[in-house]
Amino acid sequence: VTIVVKIGGAAIEDAATLRKCARSVAELAQDGHRVAVVHGGGNALTHMLSRLGKKSEFVDGLRITDAETRDTALMVLGGIINKKLVAAIQSAGMPAIGFCGGDGMTFRARKKFVHGRDLGFVGEICFAEPCWIEALWQQGGIPVLASLALGADGEYYNVNADEMAASCAAACHANTLIFLTDVPGVKDAAGSVMPWLSTKQAAELAAGSIISGGMLPKLQACGQALKQGVGRVRILPATEAEVLPQFYLTRLSCGTEVTYS
């Protein structure tokens, strides 16, 4: 089957969790599945910007991105984080090829506005061409995508990694989209992890401010993927990534399965 795995930046920064995620991704590919990885790196980007004397600001979980922040994102996401993940997957025994959404015109972006507000070089995916991803699969490789894409103006745009993962899953007609995150799953008002969550329930939780911050774009991406034909979407804690190879074989007790309604 075709599986897109989005790995959060926090998981990549922790050495033990990174190894666990990389081993699971490699094992999926070794089992004959077509696997693509999309990654974030928000914490590392925030840390680098802080070292450069820049403060990070967010609107609904999306980073306000001026030109300097965008260039730093290219360095951190397209460089350091991407190559770190590639190295980990290859250490687990599978060839991995790192690139960003702008390479090969794989993804095109347009400027994204939130509540009418211009966030700078923040984009949303408006076009996807998965031919290079499929070419890597044909050669037995694992594509590793950084969440940056080119606009029609020739500028790079910072794209929310959850949104890019959803677009990648839809473009590749993926059977499954899995988010490996630094949280145990989606929590209800009482703080308990919800094993199942419909997109309708997610909208209600967002309206009631039960979910906020980075979980908002993640759940929007889940809904986007399901609406565009992706069969299954699940949010899993990256610390339990070893369950990934059993995804189709057994019922998982961790994380949240998101369904369309």
Show where each model-derived region lies.
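C-terminal catalytic "cap/lid" subdomain
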Residues: V1-S261
